[in-house]
Amino acid sequence: MATPGNLGSSVLASKTKTKKKHFVAQKVKLFRASDPLLSVLMWGVNHSINELSHVQIPVMLMPDDFKAYSKIKVDNHLFNKENMPSHFKFKEYCPMVFRNLRERFGIDDQDFQNSLTRSAPLPNDSXARSGARFHTSYDRRYVIKTITSEDVAEMHNILKNYHQHIVECHGITLLPQFLGMYRLNVDGVEIYVIVTRNVFSHRLSVYRKYDLKGSTVAREASDKEKAKELPTLKDNDFINEGQKIYIDDNXKKVFLEKLKKDVEFLAQLKLMDYSLLVGIHDVERAEQEEVECEENDGEEEGESDGTHPVGTPPDSPGNTLNSSPPLAPGEFDPNIDVYGIKCHENSPRKEVYFMAIIDILTHYDAKKKAAHAAKXVKHGAGAEISTVNPEQYSKRFLDFIGHILT
């Protein structure tokens, strides 16, 4: 992939255009992770946010900010290799743009930094056809996904339009909330990652998960997927189970208005193959599991040898997760869990739904047109295949989602 163009006018970009080599003693703050690439991501995000905190925030973004990057190379024999690789490179794409997006999504840079650097991100077994790997930040607020160099190029192609869309909708969207994009190099291994806000709640567990495209051809989870603790189910699974999303008329109206606006934006950019990710929290089930957990904890305490339990260290995940005021069962903070919607009063079960659009970086190009032609021959022209043109895709997607909300 071609490296994004010249750095242009942003203050940060002009400071970081040239390659830096750092020979510094490792500070007290450690970035321990089982994977060296994760350690480098933690180090890089920490470095980036610290750099941004010293930069004057421009009144408006300039065209060159959408091509800018900052890059740093570290060669340091003083680093403790148990905690950090001694040689690595870290590159951040369009730092001022993503800083501006975080602000528009109501995310404070210090909070973002803490979420990604205080403790190592947690692996997530979510499957992607592309082979992408997923992690969540330790506090479960953000998702870190590996992407391809083609995805990075597509992100650069749409970033200006995406930013404008976020400005126009005042940050209230069902699109992925893109918060940072990075390249990491360690020991000859190069990966690209993108950070987004987690669609699911950071505290309410999801017991059912669906990836919905509005297509019925080959849209069923495999037996291997279904064997997982939390499988990603698909359209035919949703239909065959008779699943519905029970939200009241006002919540439905607001949701569909946002969805329509976002999907029209994607169609204009000729983007397709996106999905609605749906997570369902069962309030009564979660309460029951909590009671069982407390009973088990009580039994274990009764069997203890009388010594005092070790307290939660200040930097541990538990400390931050429990720092917010306690919420009643099924309640959530809408400033954090922005995609959450409660079920209506007549729902057969008391549920909370977390729904947003994911995987928006597929452009309708010659490859997709060829795939559409091949599938149409195989399944027939009227079949509900997923590779249709962006206008058809968006219409079918909106129709399907409209029908599952009740």
UniProtKB/Swiss-Prot annotation:
Q: Name one GO cellular component term.
A: lysosome
- Note how its activity is modulated: In rod outer segments, activated by light.
Modified residue N6-acetyllysine is at which positions? K89, K145
Q: Which GO terms describe its molecular function?
A: 1-phosphatidylinositol-4-phosphate 5-kinase activity; 1-phosphatidylinositol-5-phosphate 4-kinase activity; ATP binding; protein homodimerization activity
Query: Which of the seven top EC classes does this enzyme belong to?
Result: transferase
Q: What is its EC number?
A: 2.7.1.149
Q: Where is this region: Required for interaction with PIP5K1A?
A: 59-65
Give the catalysed reaction(s), semicolon-separated.
a 1,2-diacyl-sn-glycero-3-phospho-(1D-myo-inositol-5-phosphate) + ATP = a 1,2-diacyl-sn-glycero-3-phospho-(1D-myo-inositol-4,5-bisphosphate) + ADP + H(+); 1,2-dihexadecanoyl-sn-glycero-3-phospho-(1D-myo-inositol-5-phosphate) + ATP = 1,2-dihexadecanoyl-sn-glycero-3-phospho-(1D-myo-inositol-4,5-bisphosphate) + ADP + H(+); 1,2-dihexadecanoyl-sn-glycero-3-phospho-(1D-myo-inositol-5-phosphate) + GTP = 1,2-dihexadecanoyl-sn-glycero-3-phospho-(1D-myo-inositol-4,5-bisphosphate) + GDP + H(+)
The reply to whether Acetylation figures as a keyword in the UniProt entry is yes
| Residues annotated with N-acetylalanine modification | A2
- For this protein, what post-translational modification is recorded in UniProt? Phosphorylated in tyrosines. Phosphorylation is induced by light and increases kinase activity.
Positions carrying Phosphoserine are: S14
Please give the residue positions where the record annotates the modification Phosphothreonine. T3
Gene Ontology process terms (BP): 1-phosphatidyl-1D-myo-inositol 4,5-bisphosphate biosynthetic process; autophagosome-lysosome fusion; negative regulation of insulin receptor signaling pathway; phosphatidylinositol phosphate biosynthetic process; regulation of autophagy; vesicle-mediated cholesterol transport
Q: Which residues form the PIPK domain?
A: 33-405
Quote the Gene3D superfamilies the UniProt record gives: 2-Layer Sandwich (3.30.810.10), Phosphatidylinositol Phosphate Kinase II Beta (3.30.800.10)
Where are the residues of the annotated region Disordered?
Answer: 288-329
Taxonomy, superkingdom: Eukaryota
Q: Which UniProt keywords apply?
A: Acetylation, ATP-binding, Cell membrane, Cell projection, Cytoplasm, Kinase, Lipid metabolism, Lysosome, Membrane, Nucleotide-binding, Nucleus, Phosphoprotein, Transferase
Bias (Acidic residues) occurs at 289-304
Q: Where is the signal peptide?
A: none
Q: Where in the cell is it found?
A: Cell membrane; Nucleus; Lysosome; Cytoplasm
Checking PANTHER family in the record gives:
PHOSPHATIDYLINOSITOL 5-PHOSPHATE 4-KINASE TYPE-2 ALPHA, PHOSPHATIDYLINOSITOL-4-PHOSPHATE 5-KINASE
What exactly does this protein do? Catalyzes the phosphorylation of phosphatidylinositol 5-phosphate (PtdIns5P) on the fourth hydroxyl of the myo-inositol ring, to form phosphatidylinositol 4,5-bisphosphate (PtdIns(4,5)P2). Has both ATP- and GTP-dependent kinase activities. May exert its function by regulating the levels of PtdIns5P, which functions in the cytosol by increasing AKT activity and in the nucleus signals through ING2. May regulate the pool of cytosolic PtdIns5P in response to the activation of tyrosine phosphorylation.
Task: Summarize the subunit comment.
Answer: Homodimer. Interacts with PIP4K2B; the interaction may regulate localization to the nucleus. Probably interacts with PIP5K1A; the interaction inhibits PIP5K1A kinase activity.
Name under which the protein is recorded: Phosphatidylinositol 5-phosphate 4-kinase type-2 alpha
Q: Which organism is it from?
A: Sus scrofa
